[in-house]
């Protein structure tokens, strides 16, 4: 479904990715782990057209999307839930959700149906639907960011550090939601996450990024048992 082939991405003269390659198949959860500054977020930004690789290609459903603009990539069904949640703080919860469907030009009836679908998944958002998003807790804002991403009915969704700054009980709930999106909606997921243990636990495959290079990849359950992974990322 998605193939990133040997991309090298720079910020000015600083190289963030060095001939990095990943693949995501139909109905997979694929995680990317690595230390801060390893290039994980740059991989997602490259896929979304927020920064363009200097070399290499990105192919989605057989189409070369390497140099497309972000709005063109969004129109193809790829959704990015960035690090830090980035809700619109002055808008209400419901207005934030509607912004997620802005590019789709849905009818009023379709919009209401999608809103109710998200409210069924996140009852707390329904309770707070008229409340300014900036007044929500960190966990509620993260759930809002995920729900907003789902409003456009994505064909693939990418999460960048979704557990950052959240209480453990909220983290567990959030990962359950990500699993259900993949399982129930059959939507492929790319998960960038510093909580490597959790990421390896819910994904089928994983890539390890170090200094912009893919150093290791494979079955997540097998990687979780490897000494090098335990030592570097799992506290063992």
Show where each model-derived region lies.
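Helical segment within the ABC ATPase nucleotide-binding domain
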Residues: 172-186
